[in-house]
Amino acid sequence: HDIDKNKQETRPMKRNAVLVDGVVLNGPIIDSSSGEKFVEDVYRILMNELVYKASDINQKVCEWQEPEQLKKLLDLNIKDNGEPHEKLLQLCKNVIKYSVKTSHPRFFNQLYAGMDHYSLAARFITEALNPSVYTYEVSPVFILTEEAILKKMIEFLGWKEGDGIFSPGGSVSNMYAVNLARYKYCPDIKQKGLSSAPRLVMFTSEECHYSMKKAAAFLGIGTENVYFVKTDDRGKMIPEELENQIQRAKKEGAVPFLVSATSGTTVLGAFDPLDDIANICEKHKLWFHVDASWGGSALMSQKYRKRLHGIHRADSVAWNPHKMLMAGIQCCALLVRDNSGLLKRCHSAEATYLFQQDKFYDVQYDTGDKSIQCSRRADAFKFWMMWKALGTTGLEERINRALALTRYLASEIKKRDGFELLWEPEYANTCFWYIPPSFRNMEKGPEYWRKFSNVAPTIKERMMKKGSMMVGYQPHRDKVNFFRHIVISPQVSREDMDFVLDEIERLGRDL
């Protein structure tokens, strides 16, 4: 009877429906109850399949499938009509099953790994709120948390004041730095374009991240105007070579404007001598940028911050908390020593629909005109939440543990037959060869190195198809393919280090 009564009560609404272009506008058309149920069910799957299993070494790191087979397993086709609830849930389970578990204790493949639960919870919040961080009126909480975390990061650089912005990746942070340096020396270029500037040259090391070359291409500087400075056998920029390159550019009639040093190179984990480079930059009045995307987190360790001695003299720094600090991709900051508003002057477009100057609050909190983006994620919030939860001490312990495990692995490599450590690790990068028994008595000529270069790729293929772990490899200079092992996650133990060496030996001894 009640149901019939409710039906009768809804009939007048249907009779009085408002239509525009044949579309009924009365009431929402989204079925909130089914959507809410889907979110609840997916959340349960996430907890059971990812969060609870994140540190379970009995789980596979990956469930390898060839691309064509994976396309069939995932049913990637989009149809005119939506799929049913249960099929969507199965799809979610398959996405998890066939994705790489980067939170697994034996994922050593990249410069990110592990799962920080506080950061993850913060990401749940920001994904649900779907904010865009450009004005205080639409993102009050996230504007303030970004400001707070930037101030703290600036403090760790040793600056009394500064500015900054969170960007979508260390590559973009490096591009910001190049653009700021160019604007400082050639401010007319913003309005008049490249024709108003002389031939500009920037300098970086042979071991730099490839984003420096991309920045030159993207900003119209040109890749031929990136002068790569020689490094020593540990991968560190040689200051004398930098001086030579600057003199060379000047003799060519070019205008040097920026030097980019690296604190934590991608392959070797090397740290450039920042103080010596800063001296040269001051001598020639060049912008000094430090790409500390990987190594910047060492600043939080009293024991290891000396790796970045001299960083306080930089004009700008790129630092990615999503790497060693596990804040979750993406979480990347560009920090600038200038506090005069250079970031805003360089990038502002003064969009009047966003950045009205007669708002009812302090418009200094509207940070969007500092950014090259309009819509921008609340990436700082997850780092803020994690830092609040763990404190500086907790983050320092993570770094110290990761580097202690790295030293342990290096020491074990030196003890084992068939393993060769290529460089003593300076950070969390351990580079080594595994030499199968059949190679150990061979003469090391061209044929040896040709065959030996296939060892690491073959072992990598086997570990991926087995799903036991992931460790990266690459050639470097005169060295053929070798393993590059990265330690980050606090879930990693000494037993995992032993497992890596045992597993490589198991997978490669027959080669």
Curated annotation (Swiss-Prot):
Chain positions with N6-(pyridoxal phosphate)lysine modification: K323
Enzyme class: lyase
Keyword terms, alphabetized: Decarboxylase, Lyase, Pyridoxal phosphate
Cofactor(s) needed for function: pyridoxal 5'-phosphate
Transmembrane segment boundaries: none
GO biological process: carboxylic acid metabolic process
Enzymatic reactions: L-aspartate + H(+) = beta-alanine + CO2; 3-sulfino-L-alanine + H(+) = hypotaurine + CO2
Record GO terms (molecular function): aspartate 1-decarboxylase activity; pyridoxal phosphate binding; sulfinoalanine decarboxylase activity
Coiled coil: none
Keyword set includes Repressor: no
PROSITE patterns named among the record's database cross-references: DDC_GAD_HDC_YDC (PS00392)
Enzyme nomenclature, EC number: 4.1.1.11, 4.1.1.29
Keyword Lyase: yes
PANTHER family with a match to the protein in the record: ACIDIC AMINO ACID DECARBOXYLASE GADL1 (PTHR45677:SF1), GLUTAMATE DECARBOXYLASE-RELATED (PTHR45677)
Similarity section: Belongs to the group II decarboxylase family.
Quaternary structure (record): Homodimer.
Role played: Catalyzes the decarboxylation of L-aspartate, 3-sulfino-L-alanine (cysteine sulfinic acid), and L-cysteate to beta-alanine, hypotaurine and taurine, respectively. The preferred substrate is L-aspartate. Does not exhibit any decarboxylation activity toward glutamate.
UniProt-recorded name of the protein: Acidic amino acid decarboxylase GADL1
Species for this entry: Xenopus tropicalis (Western clawed frog)
Gene from which this protein is expressed: gadl1
